[in-house]
Amino acid sequence: MSAFCSRSTGPVAAAELFRGPQAEVTVAYQPLASPGGIIVQAMQHDRILRRELARRGMSLRFVAAGKGGDVIPMLQKGDAHFATMADMPLIEAVNVVPLSIIGQLKRNYAMVVGPRGLSAKDLKGKRIGNAFATTGHFALLKVLSSAGLSERDVALVPLDVNLMPDALRNGHVDAFAAWEPTPSLTIGRNPDRYGAIGRQQSISFLVSTREFTAQHPEAARQVAAALVRAMHWFKVDRSHVITAVRWNIAATEALTGAKPQVGEREYAKSARADLEELGYSPKMSRSLTSKRSLLLDAQEFLKSIGKVPRAAAEDALIGSFTYDIVEDVMKKPTQYYLSRFDYAP
């Protein structure tokens, strides 16, 4: 990690100055999600980001949350300006607070995990560990639906995702629904015992309140630049992933009060696979807002089973995608220091 003193990116417009009680810019994130947890850890340690925001009268704070649904009220109340969230909480969020979806953090799978040989139809009457209103919950709903079942046919056991593997191993639940890296790590450690009963593609994003991006567009671009820079940092040296994994394991322990069971190298291998799936870039494809996109299909499915209001409009979701922020930053790699790294230990 090399030190770098950033040059000025030009005069700071008066409208960009962020003074007074809101001088603190807050990013809410989930350290239990991969690879979003390690990406945000890199952003949190990014001195360039902090310097650029300081020039605009802004400080930076990161708040860890257990799941995406926990950050929705923070965005609503103005307690967070940026957040990471996956598909199901995102669909819920855009219907209650105007958002700008800035960049993509993952494209992997949420899974229902249980004993090998158990099928989706075998879940009837079973106890299933679940974190409500998460991408894991969405995967469970889809898997149950594929077998002609619904939530009423199973016993949902509310669990934090970090507790699910032990609950399954100890027989407290018969299966669990979770997002990466928990499913793959659980199966990888016990390949003869556990398998994926079903899975659903899961995507997650960095979002901002629309109010913040409208009032402070350059500050939003600086945060986007830190996101791009973090992924590039991971790409240029594989050891950087291990560094961020260590930071994230510490954040996870602080959040949950327990040391994660996963080892550093095991976690890093899973995170690298997720980063490679995105090409180490947060740039979003226009297909995300096509008529047959995963998100629109998910919204229609959630409406059909009463998980989001039937009045939820496609426009609220599609209109939240703000492609140009990351795209503008990537067109100006020198101005935004995309290949310069200065990460605090």
What do these predicted ranges mean?
Residues 157, 162-260:
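Pocket-lining segment of extracytoplasmic ligand-binding domains
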Residues 41-44, 76, 94-95, 124, ...:
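Alpha-helix boundary recognition
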Residues 34, 216-310:
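Secondary-structure end/capping motifs
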Residues 1-24, 332-345:
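Short, low-complexity disordered leader/linker segments with a strong preference
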Residues 294-345:
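Conserved C-terminal helix/tail region of periplasmic/extracytoplasmic solute-binding proteins
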Residues 45, 67-71, 86-89, 136-139, ...:
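Stable alpha-helical elements in mature extracytoplasmic
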Residues 10-158, 174-177, 194-200, 328:
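Short, glycine-/small- and polar/acidic-enriched structural segments
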Residues 95-97, 114, 188-191, 207-209, ...:
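Short secondary-structure transition/capping segments
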